[in-house]
From Swiss-Prot:
The lineage of its organism: Bacteria, Pseudomonadati, Pseudomonadota, Gammaproteobacteria, Pseudomonadales. This is Phospho-N-acetylmuramoyl-pentapeptide-transferase. The gene is mraY. It comes from Azotobacter vinelandii (strain DJ / ATCC BAA-1303). InterPro entries: Glycosyl_transferase_4 (IPR000715), PNAcMuramoyl-5peptid_Trfase (IPR003524), PNAcMuramoyl-5peptid_Trfase_CS (IPR018480). The keyword Coiled coil does not apply. Disulfide bonds: none annotated. Catalyzes the initial step of the lipid cycle reactions in the biosynthesis of the cell wall peptidoglycan: transfers peptidoglycan precursor phospho-MurNAc-pentapeptide from UDP-MurNAc-pentapeptide onto the lipid carrier undecaprenyl phosphate, yielding undecaprenyl-pyrophosphoryl-MurNAc-pentapeptide, known as lipid I. It catalyses: UDP-N-acetyl-alpha-D-muramoyl-L-alanyl-gamma-D-glutamyl-meso-2,6-diaminopimeloyl-D-alanyl-D-alanine + di-trans,octa-cis-undecaprenyl phosphate = di-trans,octa-cis-undecaprenyl diphospho-N-acetyl-alpha-D-muramoyl-L-alanyl-D-glutamyl-meso-2,6-diaminopimeloyl-D-alanyl-D-alanine + UMP. It holds the Pfam family Glycos_transf_4. It is a multi-pass membrane protein.
């Protein structure tokens, strides 16, 4: 929006041309979303408290969590609002990737909002029934996959790239739709499973989102892409604005979500942010790198799958409680220790993911 205004104002002063620079708009995206989140956060928390929109706590979970009962939830709406406003202000709104990622984010956020609403407002412990949750996730995930497949301008946009073996490219054809569906929906649910402790999900999301922003910038630049042997995706660079907004909104939310949390993001935030990461990774053809950098999300998801499978097959549990962050709590780790150690793991994994740019 402001890019169009700057282009118009260039006829009066050439200084407005600076707004065209992607890096500047990425930084402005961070700052705008951060300021919005910090300014709107206190108002949203008060509103949630007044309306008694508070978190329910499982009785069979760690005893330390009982004090969290009633903490305002659905704070993910703050994150999504800051991301959307900042992106609409600073991104090139003629870019199809910007609209794709923004649409997927908000649509998955809508699924989470309905789930949270039923749990918190209607006091329905089931929330949105799983079959309907996965149905709408599938509808929106497949919709995004079909759109990206149908609008692909080069074979590289639907080719699977393997880090460290960049000379091997696997044309996916229609299988691209299937892979994209699983990446988006899987990433959405993985982040949601991770969102169980104060700040546990949002900081890894910010770090992975920032790293994906670097991939977007490099993939959108033909020279960088050719030099690094990564797919050149015209227009992908514009997603650095969205990634910047995600970073700013995430850090602003963390201000209130850090231990002890004043607000939780709820499904409205977790499902949306996970879907956003998955969609961006698909666009820049870095699904495998997302799997690496989002290792904490993968670990949380696998712990649930292993726990369920083990209990159904043997009647025994592998972990004291799943997702795995609760296992460590029940082992006696204080909540802040679990959180920070998972953050440290993410820092290492993100650095490994970025290192694949040069390793070949």
């Amino acid at each position: 929006m402001l890019l169009l205004l700057a282009e118009y104002l260039q006829q009066f002063h050439t200084g407005f041309a600076v707004v065209q620079y992607l890096t500047l708009r990425g930084i402005l995206g961070v700052l705008t979303a951060l300021i919005l989140a910090l300014c709107l956060g206190p108002w949203m928390i008060r509103t949630l408290q007044i309306r008694q929109i508070g978190q329910a706590v499982r009785d069979d979970g760690p005893q330390s969590h009982l004090s969290k009962k009633g903490t305002p939830t659905m704070g993910g709406a703050l994150i999504l609002s800051a991301i959307a406003i900042s992106t609409l202000l600073w991104a090139d709104l003629s870019n199809r990737y910007v609209w794709t990622v923004l649409a997927v984010t908000l649509l998955f956020g809508a699924i989470g909002w309905v789930d949270d609403y039923r749990k918190v407002i209607e006091k329905n412990s089931r929330g949105l029934p799983s079959r309907w949750k996965y149905f709408w996730q599938s509808v929106f995930g497949l919709g995004a996959a079909l759109f990206l497949y149908m609008t692909a301008q080069t074979p590289a946009e639907t080719t699977l790239i393997l880090p460290l073996i960049k000379t091997i490219e696997i044309p996916l054809g229609a299988a691209f739709i299937v892979l994209t569906y699983f990446v988006i929906v899987g990433s959405s649910n993985a982040v949601n499973l991770t969102d169980g402790l104060d700040g546990l999900a949002i900081m890894p999301t910010v770090m992975v989102g920032g790293a994906l922003g670097i991939f977007c910038y490099l993939s959108g630049n033909v020279k960088f892409a050719e030099y690094l042997l990564i797919p050149s995706v015209a227009g992908a660079g514009e997603l650095i604005v969205f990634c910047g907004a995600l970073i700013g909104a995430g850090l602003g939310f963390l201000w209130f979500n850090t231990y002890p949390a004043q607000v939780f993001m709820g499904d409205v935030g977790a499902l949306a942010l996970g879907a956003a990461l998955g969609t961006i990774a698909v666009i820049v053809r870095q699904e495998v790198v997302l799997f690496i950098m989002g290792g904490v999300f993968v670990m949380e998801t696998l712990s649930v799958m292993i726990q369920v499978a083990s209990f159904k097959l043997t009647g025994k549990r592998v972990f004291r409680m799943a997702p795995i962050h609760h296992h460590f709590e029940l082992k006696g780790w204080p909540e802040p220790r679990v959180i920070v150690r998972f953050w440290i793991i993410t820092v290492v994994l993100v650095l490994i993911g970025l290192a694949t740019l040069k390793l070949r």
